[in-house]
Amino acid sequence: ANGYDTFVRINGLKYDNDNNLWMTNSGKDKTEGVLNPIKILKSDGKWISLRYPEIAGLNNLERTMFDKRGNFWVISSWIADYGVFCLDTKGTLEDSSDDKHKFIKNFTNQDGTILSHNGIYCITEDKNGAIWIGTGQGPIILNNPSNFFEDDFYCTQIKVPRDDGTNLADFLLAN
């Protein structure tokens, strides 16, 4: 054994607007804690564990954020499990039956191309409410993050004109 057969990571600690402390619990040790990867320490001291099948047992749930709508975003940056998870609790932390949640591994851009990333590294929201995600293929933008849960959801890649008379463009920071 190389010493890495089991591990657990606590990461992405963030407070929500109700002063609840959220965190991720991920790792290679498929214990109950890791299979319930979102933990919340409520402001009253009570712990809540949330389980969503699409991210249960992922190795590296890291960066997190809350958007202006109160949705909780999580990046999985492990090579085999990279992707973005979004959770809308509908304001009911202790009732997950009404939650909307989705994990996207491969995004589709505005041209209908499925992006095969070699990593997802960071996430933030701009002043207009768009979500920016830093990937190994350059930034992608979720201009309407509320549509993340829809089947026909797509992201935008910024195109930089080549200015060589061909009307061709390259994606910003790709390759």
Regions found by a protein language model. Name each.
Residues A1-N175:
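Carboxylate-rich, polar loop motifs that coordinate divalent cations or form catalytic acidic clusters
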